[in-house]
A protein has these predicted regions:
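Proteins that catalyze or organize thiol-disulfide redox chemistry
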Residues: 1-52, 56-122
Length: 122
């Protein structure tokens, strides 16, 4: 799902799945690196498949993009990109990950956090 947070939230509730928010930007080089090099790794893909995924662009022109930047700022106190957040099916924040990492294990660990915020066991 791209640029439709409300649709992602509704789908997460319907499917009882957590939400993975990818706050990204059209001009974000580190975002493209994560998409091309981290999200394509099998272990990461396996974890991402457990989520309702939504990509929210924050650097476009217009109210829609401004609303996503405002959402990121108000809920997570940052406008840095890339920025990733995990929410439960009710939209409650569970975990965040800021920036780029080249360590698959670090990112997979973030994705495996359970609703209590602890690292889930394999």
């Amino acid at each position: 799902i791209t640029n439709d947070f409300n649709h992602a939230l509704a789908r997460a509730k319907q499917e009882n799945k957590p939400i993975f928010i990818d706050f990204t930007g059209y001009t974000c080089t580190n975002c493209r690196w994560m998409e091309a090099n981290m999200f394509t790794q099998d272990a990461v893909k396996d974890e991402l498949n457990k989520y309702v995924r939504v990509r929210l662009y924050t650097d476009g022109e217009g109210e829609l993009y401004e609303s996503f930047q405002k959402l990121q700022q108000e809920r997570f106190n940052t406008v840095a990109l890339p920025f990733y957040a995990v929410l439960d099916p009710n939209g409650v924040s569970q975990a965040t990950f800021a920036g780029l990492t080249r360590e698959q294990s670090e990112f997979v660990g973030f994705l495996r956090r359970n609703p209590s915020g602890e690292i889930a066991q394999k």
